[in-house]
Amino acid sequence: MLRAILLSLLFACGLSACNQGSAPTPAKPINLSAAVNTAKVGNAVLQSQTVPLSSINASTARHYGIDTAHEGVLLLITLRDSSGNALAPADLTLSVTGSVLPDPPQPLPLRAIQTAGMTDYIAVLHTKAPASIAFKIVATRAGDSAEVATTVELQR
């Protein structure tokens, strides 16, 4: 009996320490726009990910020269061989289009960035939220090609 009372008191103390007089903070929603899309071109693996510019921290933005002063979406493309090793930048040809729906797609310039000795590529599409943004990536390597199409919702 004493053991049950002590356990109850210990549990109550633990709960009261968690409260600290303020309401619990709700969990942040999962950023579904950060979903990764994957395609293979021969033995090359292409992965793309979209990230709202507002979620990129200032030091990362400065380091990679990303303008986060305006709303929009960053498209990050990584290229690796099937073992996860770097590919030579000239080994694969990439083209990207982007559009704020329902507008027609426009070519987007890609910029190479170096990350841990590997070359990744970024493109930025500036637009005001709320917006639906569509990206299409075409990758070509030694006669093989693959497409990745993705749509992201930019929220306020």
Regions found by a protein language model. Give the residues of each.
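Bacterial N-terminal signal peptides that target proteins for export
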Residues: 1-6
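Bacterial Sec-type N-terminal signal peptides, specifically the leucine/valine-rich hydrophobic h-region
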Residues: 12-15
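Bacterial signal peptide processing site
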Residues: 18-22
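Beta-strand-rich domain onsets/edges
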Residues: 23-74
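Beta-strand-rich structural segments
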Residues: 72-83
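Short flexible loop/turn segments that cap and initiate beta-strands
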Residues: 82-96, 103-107
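Short, solvent-exposed, Trp/other aromatic-anchored flexible loops in extracytoplasmic proteins
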Residues: 109-136
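Edge beta-strands of extracellular beta-sandwich domains
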Residues: 146-154
